[in-house]
Amino acid sequence: MNIKPLNDRVAVKYLEEEEKTRSGIVLPDTAKEEKPQQGEIVAVGKGCTPEDGDPEVKVGDLVVFDKYSGTKVTIDGEDYIILNLEDVLAVIEK
């Protein structure tokens, strides 16, 4: 993948959706039509690094983002979303 977000934007790859819940319930296709709200940051624009040099997000971070934000793009058959940094709501720490 070769994408370079500009300014304060990040490129996020959608996480694969689960086929069934943790309790074993198989999800129908209609339930999977909902837009995912989690993904992995694959590229970060230069405007995402503050002057003190400590970025809030970096490549490889798993993030939660606003449901109706960003621009969806498909590159080499993979779905990504380009988000403004302010639309990233949280970093998922393991």
UniProtKB/Swiss-Prot annotation:
Keywords: Chaperone, Cytoplasm. GO terms for biological process: chaperone cofactor-dependent protein refolding. The keyword Chaperone applies. Its main location: cytoplasm. SMART domains: Cpn10 (SM00883). One of its GO terms (cellular component) is cytoplasm. It is found in: Cytoplasm. Disulfide bonds: none annotated. The keyword Zinc does not apply. SUPFAM superfamilies: GroES-like (SSF50129). InterPro entries: Chaperonin_GroES (IPR020818), Chaperonin_GroES_sf (IPR037124), Chaprnonin_Cpn10_CS (IPR018369), GroES-like_sf (IPR011032). GO terms for molecular function: ATP binding; metal ion binding; protein folding chaperone; protein-folding chaperone binding; unfolded protein binding. It holds the Pfam family Cpn10. Belongs to the GroES chaperonin family. Heptamer of 7 subunits arranged in a ring. Interacts with the chaperonin GroEL. PANTHER family: 10 KDA HEAT SHOCK PROTEIN, 20 KDA CHAPERONIN, CHLOROPLASTIC. Together with the chaperonin GroEL, plays an essential role in assisting protein folding. The GroEL-GroES system forms a nano-cage that allows encapsulation of the non-native substrate proteins and provides a physical environment optimized to promote and accelerate protein folding. GroES binds to the apical surface of the GroEL ring, thereby capping the opening of the GroEL channel. This is Co-chaperonin GroES. It comes from Halothermothrix orenii (strain H 168 / OCM 544 / DSM 9562). The gene is groES.
